[in-house]
Amino acid sequence: TEIEKPAYPVIDFHMHMGKMLLGESYETKYDTKEYVRELQDAGVVCAVNMDGYFGKDLEKMQKKQEGFEEMFFNFMQLDFSAYDDPDFCDKTKKVIEDSCMRGCRGIKLWKDLSLWERDKYGRPIRTDDPRFDIFYDTAAKLHIPVLMHVADPAAFFTPKSEKNERWEELDVCPEWDFSDHEKYMSFEELMEMQENTVRSHP
């Protein structure tokens, strides 16, 4: 049976409208009105955009969404490049508050935080870092969710071989291979980190 319309209104909870996948010139790559029409034709009543970012990037995204503010909910992203600065926590807290005031509905933390981001000593930046408590507490105070992408499929953390169930994916995308545990945290470590984070901030 061909189903042309969903039985219920659809909320697309994970979409990308901006530079993360489309590059800095994303605003020239699609027409927002046409995009909304296609979403509505598919039964989508609203969508959560993970490319809200903050500051001027957020302003740029909101301009791209003008006229369709009720259709899109933006989640902000945070910048960890100044992680080692003494005022990093205070500045990031202000970014969260400002982005929320400008309309962001949540925070998105990407897997690069613990897989690629490093402090000045070369150690992975962890989501259960006590310094991050202020971010989670601020989000709770503002009544916005924190969406975390922690790790990837467990097979990405084991060596690529004929016994690896994701061998074909790893062959096509070798950058998804996190099996070097001298370079990356193990899958088990990442899961423990996630449990610690949720336990501390239910």
Where are these regions (language model features)?
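Conserved N-terminal glycine/acidic-rich loop preference
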Residues: 173, 181-201
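An N-terminally biased module of ancient metal coordination in phosphate/nucleic-acid-related enzymes
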Residues: 1-67, 90
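Active-site gating/metal-coordination segments in enzymes
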Residues: 58-182
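Generic structural signal for hydrophobic
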Residues: 38-39, 99, 139, 197
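Short Gly/charged-rich anion-binding patches and loops
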Residues: 34, 94, 134, 192-193
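Single, functionally critical "micro-switch" positions that shape active/binding sites
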Residues: 11-13, 148, 202
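A conditional alpha-helix N-cap/helix-loop micro-motif detector
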Residues: 25-29, 54, 85-89, 125-129, ...
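A short helix-to-beta-strand connector/capping loop
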Residues: 6-7, 70-71, 202
